[in-house]
């Protein structure tokens, strides 16, 4: 740091084009309105989700297309609207952008953007969201993807918050009835 300003950090990134996973030195993000900068203390590795991303990145272009027909359809629709060459360029630009891995972390707020009532610097929080709660030293997270931690919850346990929320959402969608047996797997 220089006069309290954070200059750089490390972040785990996945190269979607060639499949390589790397730890990269990147700038510390700055929180905007409605966001907090969180110093990460624990980051959860989701074996299923992150394995899927890594396996996707390691596939050939044809393999990527076969595994994501939804994206192929979006690409064809874009080509019809905007033309083939701009679409091809957009696809290669997207593949050249490294993807931040992770979506469930816990840490301490070190800076706040405007309109972050209910949160304060020094507050311990759980963070959620792909592209927000990544495997990095610091994350900028919007207020709707933050939740304060009770004093008796440690960072390692809090890093499971997102997975618990996903399981709870799935449980609610299933609408189980009183007396039914259910199993939550994954």
Language model features: what each stretch is:
Residues 11, 181-182:
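Conserved hydrophobic helix-helix packing surfaces used for dimerization/oligomerization
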């Amino acid at each position: 740091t220089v006069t309290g300003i954070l200059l750089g950090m490390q972040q785990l990134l996945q190269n979607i084009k060639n499949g390589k996973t790397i730890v990269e030195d990147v700038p510390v993000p700055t929180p905007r309105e409605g966001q907090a900068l969180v110093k990460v203390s624990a980051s959860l590795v989701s074996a299923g989700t992150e394995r899927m991303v890594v396996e996707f990145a390691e596939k050939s272009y044809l393999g990527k297309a076969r595994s994501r027909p939804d994206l192929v359809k979006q690409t064809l629709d874009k080509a019809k609207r905007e033309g083939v060459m701009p679409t091809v360029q957009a696809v290669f630009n997207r593949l050249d952008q490294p993807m931040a891995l992770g979506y469930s972390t816990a840490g301490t707020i070190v800076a706040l953007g405007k309109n972050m009532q209910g949160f304060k610097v020094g507050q311990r929080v759980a963070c959620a969201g792909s592209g927000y709660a990544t495997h990095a030293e610091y994350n900028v997270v919007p207020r709707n993807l933050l939740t304060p931690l009770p004093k008796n919850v440690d960072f390692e346990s809090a890093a499971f918050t997102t997975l618990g929320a996903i399981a709870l959402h799935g449980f609610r969608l299933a609408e189980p009835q009183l007396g039914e047996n259910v199993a939550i797997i994954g």
